[in-house]
């Protein structure tokens, strides 16, 4: 087995701002696995920045286990030598792609998804000026679900602008840990009246227990507070939805396991992304078959996408082509 690791940078159309800061481009690693017969599998990862992951740290992790991987690896042994995170995600997704190519079997079938459906993704509007948020909302007025990034100071005004421009859309609000429970309770009634259907990770990871005091009616989704199945116990009874992201789980293998266990516990599932290219969205679409909410809009945020990229029609995602992945 040959392992190749490449670093790439994908500029955004406009700088993308969330409560933690802004970025002009997304840096990713792409792992390519090639077997002795020339079959190739690819996987992309951006890593988890709030866990301190960088391109350099992910590449270092992979170089440390290169000899083991080049001797041959499967999903179980991969999970034993790499922790959850971007490095394992890239290899795990490349391995799914490789096995699909080796067996000439669609990845959906390998994952136990008999009849994959096209998914409807939300589109994300970053933190910006009133004019920019309003313009963005008008651009996506026909999309059924709009996600609005907010922070501790800018919240209701942005949601009002989106509602005015998109009267029929559902709205997801994402503070990225920027609120506390008191602010959440103050905002919740108007958020409900504005048609907000979900609030993602309102409070910081580690302060989840404060949500025992939440009095609102809008559902809450755990994002930064849950990486993989080990985090489910922390959020039960506090959140109603779990945001599954492959960079957090360490790949599609654990993402599927997390989604299935969350559903068994009575939680709904959201499948999100780290704003990658279509190569990262494709395995996300497999996990998305188990989700009530889908946020796989990464390619639309970039100035350009990969060859054979996933096509979007007002949020409706085309199933990925095998030439891309799977």
Give the ranges of each region predicted by the language model.
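N-terminal capping/lid subdomain adjacent to the active-site entrance of alpha/beta enzymes
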Residues: 1-171, 178-185, 189-193, 306-326
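Catalytic core of soluble alpha/beta enzymes
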Residues: 148, 153-289, 296-297, 303-315
């Amino acid at each position: 087995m040959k392992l190749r690791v490449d670093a790439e940078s994908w500029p955004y159309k406009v700088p993308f701002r969330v409560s933690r800061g802004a970025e002009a481009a997304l840096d990713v690693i792409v792992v390519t696995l090639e077997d002795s017969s020339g079959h190739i599998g690819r996987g992309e990862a951006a890593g988890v920045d709030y866990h301190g992951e960088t391109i350099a740290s992910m590449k270092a992790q992979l170089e440390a286990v290169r000899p083991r991987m080049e001797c041959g690896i499967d999903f179980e042994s991969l999970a034993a030598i790499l922790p959850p995170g971007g490095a394992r995600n890239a290899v795990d997704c490349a391995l799914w792609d490789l096995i699909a190519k080796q067996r000439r079997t669609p990845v959906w079938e390998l994952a136990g998804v008999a009849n994959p459906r096209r998914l409807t993704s939300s589109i994300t509007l970053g933190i910006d000026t009133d004019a920019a948020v309003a313009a963005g909302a008008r651009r996506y007025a026909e999309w059924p679900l709009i996600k609005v990034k907010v922070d501790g100071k800018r919240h209701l005004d942005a949601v009002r602008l989106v509602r005015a421009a998109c009267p029929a859309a559902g709205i997801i609000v994402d503070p990225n840990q920027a609120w506390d429970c008191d602010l959440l309770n103050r905002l919740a009634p108007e958020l409900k009246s504005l048609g907000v259907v979900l609030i993602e990770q309102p409070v910081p990871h580690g302060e989840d227990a404060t949500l025992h005091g939440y009095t609102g009616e809008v559902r809450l989704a755990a994002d930064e507070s849950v990486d993989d199945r080990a985090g489910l116990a922390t959020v039960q009874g506090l959140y109603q939805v779990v945001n599954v992201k492959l960079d957090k789980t360490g790949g599609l293998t654990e993402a599927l396991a997390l989604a299935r266990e969350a559903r068994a516990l009575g939680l709904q599932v959201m499948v999100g992304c780290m704003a990658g290219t279509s190569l990262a969205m494709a395995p996300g679409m497999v996990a998305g078959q188990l989700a009530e909410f889908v946020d796989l809009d990464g390619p639309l945020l970039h100035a350009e996408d990969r060859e054979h990229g996933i096509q979007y029609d007002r949020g409706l995602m085309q199933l990925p082509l095998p030439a891309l992945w799977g």
